[in-house]
A protein has these predicted regions:
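Membrane-embedded alpha-helical segments of integral membrane proteins
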Residues: 1-45
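Serine-dependent acyl-ester chemistry module
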Residues: 2-9, 214-309, 314, 318-330, ...
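Cytosolic-side transmembrane helix boundary signature
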Residues: 30-67
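Transmembrane alpha-helices and immediately adjacent membrane-cytoplasm interface residues
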Residues: 62-88
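Membrane/wall-proximal cationic-aromatic binding patches
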Residues: 84-179, 322-326
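Conserved SGNH/GDSL esterase-like catalytic core that processes O-acyl groups on lipids
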Residues: 159-234
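Short, amphipathic alpha-helical "lid/cap" segments that border enzyme active or binding sites
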Residues: 191, 195, 266, 270, ...
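Histidine-centered active-site loop/cap adjacent to the catalytic His
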Residues: 329-363
Length: 363
């Protein structure tokens, strides 16, 4: 379990310093060594003396109450965790806004037709969600389905956590290009959930100009979670797979993944991104895979990006961001970072926006 082994089996995470994985593995190694030494030097001698004096059956009978108590403690803990509020969407950092509600198809979605407020980065942010469950300028905003539209899909980076609506990437791109832009992103979504949300929403827009899908290597780990609706083999949409919550907690504390699990996630992610571009082309729209990265990138994130996108032959728009362009106490891009991303997307799409595409201001 050296540094290379950790890089291979512990994926980069947006909200988790990779150094934590190295420390966790180091602590685990020390703990295993200590346990082995204790077993050899202490427990073996005690067990030998106790067996000689009492007999194996007596020892088992004496230990039975403790073992039963341990089993019951695990069972009760599992029940407590299952009855507590538990959802993948509540990944750190936890925020009460924008408010989420259960969705039988996608797992969760924004609560439609409301506005909520939350302090983020020292600012009071208004999160307005329209009747279609899309973040917008106000709850009463209604996109014109007949207007030329740029559709953005993804998760909280696109939804604009910590940003006022005009500061979000979709709003900035729409303003710069003078066309309607709509966000169908939902906080906490993995790539496959974002794609399914896009498939639900895209047919409603009669004149899509472009489809922009976010992909971040630091969020790839979400694509391997199965305790939510997800794609199985062959891009078959499957319901959440029941799992022990205690096992999930342990995995999140030590997020080890096997080579096979990671490879399956790579193949699924490639297929979803290719399908996104194909769906855009089928509607006569320009497809863009948007990949903002904070620099310098972690080596593991670079390797993952190249493995999924470059080796997969998937074109993408890479937007480097300064590490300081993060919301205070949070990992999301701040207004400076969002502005740089918005400028890059607008520049990428400008050649594909026909003259007189403006219909009315974006939602």
């Amino acid at each position: 379990m050296n540094h290379a082994w950790v890089d291979r089996h512990f994926l980069p995470e947006f909200f988790r310093d990779h150094a934590l994985n190295l420390r966790a593995v180091l602590i685990l190694r020390i703990g295993l060594v200590a346990l082995g030494v204790a077993t050899i030097t202490l427990l073996r001698r005690w067990a030998a003396r106790a067996t000689a004096r009492l007999g194996a059956l007596s020892i088992l009978m004496a230990a039975a109450p403790s073992l039963l108590a341990l089993v019951l403690a695990v069972a009760v803990s599992e029940i407590i965790v299952r009855t507590a509020a538990w959802r993948v969407a509540a990944e750190a950092p936890k925020t009460p806004e924008p408010q989420l509600q259960a969705d039988p198809r996608l797992g969760w979605r924004f609560t439609p037709g409301r506005v909520g407020y939350w302090i983020k980065g020292g600012r009071r942010i208004a999160y307005a969600i329209d009747a279609g469950g899309r973040r917008a300028a106000s709850p009463s905003s209604r996109p014109d389905m007949n207007c030329p539209t740029i559709v953005f899909a993804g998760e909280s980076i696109i939804a604009g956590v910590g940003l006022q609506w005009p500061e979000t990437i979709p709003a900035q791109v729409g303003q710069r290009l003078g066309v309607q832009s709509v966000s169908v992103a939902v906080n906490g979504f993995a790539t496959d959930q974002a794609y399914m949300r896009l498939k639900d929403q895209l047919p409603r827009f009669h004149r899509p100009l472009a489809v922009v899908m976010l992909f971040s290597p630091a969020l790839f780990w979400k694509n391997l979670q199965v305790d939510r609706p997800h794609f199985g083999p062959g891009l078959v949409w499957q319901p959440a797979r029941p799992t022990l919550r205690l096992t999930e907690i342990a995995h999140r504390a030590v997020p080890y993944l096997s080579d096979a699990e990671i490879e399956a996630g790579v193949q699924m992610t490639r297929a979803v991104l290719r399908a996104t571009l194909a769906d855009a082309r089928a509607r006569g729209a320009e497809g863009v895979i948007l990949t903002p990265v904070f620099t310098p990138e972690e080596p593991g994130a670079v390797a993952l990006r190249r493995r999924i996108l470059d080796q997969g032959g998937i074109p993408y728009l890479l937007v480097p961001l300064d590490q300081t362009w993060r919301i205070q106490g949070d990992g999301h891009p701040d207004p400076r970072g969002a502005r740089v991303v918005g400028e890059a997307v607008a520049a990428r799409l400008k050649p594909h926006i026909p003259p007189n595409s403006a219909c009315r201001s974006g939602s």
